């Protein structure tokens, strides 16, 4: 499960990899969303969280030599889930193409089968936390973690760009373009 946080042209995400309902078997982390400040928005922050889940999962797969398995990604960003899992196109003019393409390519080359689950966000505003299912609780936790990490990093982390591991990227001076027409 991952959730993004965005404010003042800066984005972060909280993420957790957990083995079913077992909260003891989990990896939790937070990341700053890559990209130029002009490209930042809530959607990109959510994509940054999805990318973090994919990268950390890839590291675990490589370290443990995992040859097959299924991972279910939970996220409250329906448009991000749609762009990654349901669209059949992958065009550079698509907003945030750099992250979407990277995520899709990494998933396509993974030894794992990736599935998704839309998790309704901010469920704790209408339902007591202890009454939420596992997915709802994890989303609330990751929302909180993303906000805490935003507060810790927004004043000190400069914009940065992830290297494109599939294909090529387009730059103008020192800025990597997230999409182009």
Regions flagged by a language model, labelled:
Residues 17, 135-141, 154-160:
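Compositionally biased, low-complexity linear motifs
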Residues 9, 48-140, 162-165:
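RNase H catalytic domain
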Residues 144, 148-181:
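Charged boundary/loop elements
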Residues 34-37, 107-112, 151-157:
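Low-complexity, flexible helical/coil segments
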Residues 1-48, 52-64, 85, 149:
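RNase H-like nuclease fold core
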Residues 23-27, 97-100, 140-145:
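Glycine-rich loops and low-complexity Gly/Arg-rich segments
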